[in-house]
């Protein structure tokens, strides 16, 4: 793992969290219980404080940063998709930020909301509970349905379960030179499938 103290502030990581060895945590970063931090994520707390609350996930290649005297927060059970950028914003409890979305300074994403992939949420945006946001700039297009929220929660549970799986079975290795016969497939822990 790449942890760096900055001007006397050391990242805080709960012992039940999983931080991938290629992720980088710098300075004023607080990671809660059962959190998953994916490969190549960068949590750069060299200005503002970064807080990832219990059960949330920050997936591969995500960036968190913010200005001085601000907190960038991912609420409990928050779900931050691959490549998303969070800068000085607040992601509400049980919300999802889709892949490669950008959430700017002072923006607040409401609880149980979903930000569609590739969306751009402008600085100062104030979302409400259970909104589906999409576009550039993002706007609320409708409410999140019960089925969509259930789907989001299944995906988040997969990452919460992945924390324990990684603690138990992830290790560095050398590659095989050819694929073995009857190579098994990995299985998730829920029946979640991609949204179509």
UniProtKB/Swiss-Prot annotation:
The keyword Transferase applies. Keywords: Repeat, Transferase. Residues 173-196 are annotated as: Disordered. Pathway: Amine and polyamine metabolism; carnitine metabolism. Pfam families: Hexapep. The keyword Magnesium does not apply. One of its GO terms (biological process) is carnitine metabolic process. This is Carnitine operon protein CaiE. It comes from Escherichia coli O1:K1 / APEC.
